[in-house]
Amino acid sequence: MINVLIVEDDPMVGELNKRYLSQIDGFQLKGIASSFQSALHILGEHHIDLILLDIYMPGKNGLELLTELRAQNEAVDVIVISAASELDVIKKTLRYGAVDYLIKPFEFERFQTALSDYRRKQKVYSTHRNMSQKELDAELFQKKEATEKVQLPKGLTKSTLKLIWSS
C-alpha cells in the first residue's frame, strides 16, 4: 500500500480528495492536514510515501512545505493539487520534485491518471535494482506519448506548449 497524506486547508476539497483516493486501489490515507504545522506533525507520526499538496493555504503555504521537506531531505513524493496556475509556481514545484501537478478544478479521470501513473512507477522502482536505457526510456516517456494524443485547448498549439514548458 502507498501511504498518502492530503494537505488541504479547505475541508470540502480535502473530503473530495479523500473520496477520490478511496476509489483507487493501492492507496491508504494516513491523514488530512489543513496547515503546514499539522502536515509536519502527521509526517512525524506516520510513514508517508505520497503527499497530495495544496499550494494556497493560510500561514505557510504548500510551496514552503515542499521547500522544507526538501531541505530536510524527506524522501516523500508530492503531487500538487492546487488552484495555483501561475507558471512560476508550477515550475518551482516541479524543480522541488513534484511528480505531477493538477490545477483545480479537475476531473476525477485526471486525478485517477496521476495516481495510477504514480502507483505504476512505484511498482517498477520497487521491483528493479537496475534498468537498461531502453527500460528507462520506456518508463520516462510512456506518459509523454499518451499526453500527445490529448486535444489541446483552442488557440494552443504543440509548439507553443513546448515553448512554455521549456522556458
Which residues fall in each region the model found?
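Short amphipathic alpha-helix used as the core "switch/output" element in two-component signaling
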Residues: 63-74
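Receiver (REC) domain active-site loop signature in two-component systems and cognate sites
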Residues: 57
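Acidic, metal-coordinating helix/loop segments flanking the phosphotransfer/catalytic sites
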Residues: 32-50
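Active-site residues of response regulator receiver
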Residues: 54, 82
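Acidic catalytic/metal-coordinating carboxylates
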Residues: 35, 61-64
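Conserved acidic carboxylate
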Residues: 8
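C-terminal output/effector regions of signal-responsive regulators
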Residues: 136-167
